[in-house]
Amino acid sequence: MDSHSYSRLPDVKGYAWFIFDQVNWYRSQSAAYTERNGGKPLPALAFFHIPLPEYNQAAADESAILIGTRMEKACAPLLNTGMFAAMKEAGDVMGTFVGHDHDNDYSVMWHGILLAYGRFTGGNTEYNHLQNDARVILMKENVRTFTTWIRTKGGEIVDKTIYPDSYRKDDWRKRPPVGEK
């Protein structure tokens, strides 16, 4: 989904936000898929460029488990038009994946939805303190879980997590390391 670029309102500086038509389109598409699936939301992921304002809320929450690198505040829009709330209400989106901030590759759970960054993959830009790598996502059809990690150019797997298990604070110390049973 297109998260646009810069604010079109002269008195609101910074980055753009999803417009209401986009939020409504998502709501109608989600409802249609849920209805076709017998009233049960289909597990889904969302991909867009600019992070939602909730990325900063989640990253600042001391009770949240943040996995990965956060070297800068999310450059999110100043206005919030409710896309995250729409996803939460619909119950289909398990995680959102964004880019935009070259010095972030973290993932953090916020109200049951994983908010994650990809990894800087472009060329030489204004700033890039992380090396070019990639976020990999492995989903299973019709199951509300996925595994994600950063894969380095050298083939190393970094920050491998399983949604939602890796982000449960209540018993995370009792769980085996990722990849072990």
At which residue positions do the language-model features occur?
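Short, solvent-exposed loop/turn segments at secondary-structure junctions
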Residues: 4-6, 51-53, 120-123, 142
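His/acidic metal-ligating clusters that form di-metal
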Residues: 11-105, 175-176
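Acidic carboxylate-rich catalytic motifs and surrounding loops in phosphoryl-/glycosyl-chemistry enzymes
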Residues: 3, 97-100, 150-153
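Structured catalytic/translocation cores of nucleotide/phosphate-coupled proteins
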Residues: 1, 46, 51, 135, ...
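Active-site-proximal beta-strand elements of phosphoester/diester hydrolases
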Residues: 1-8, 47, 114-120
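Binuclear metal-dependent phosphoesterase catalytic core
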Residues: 83-90, 104-181
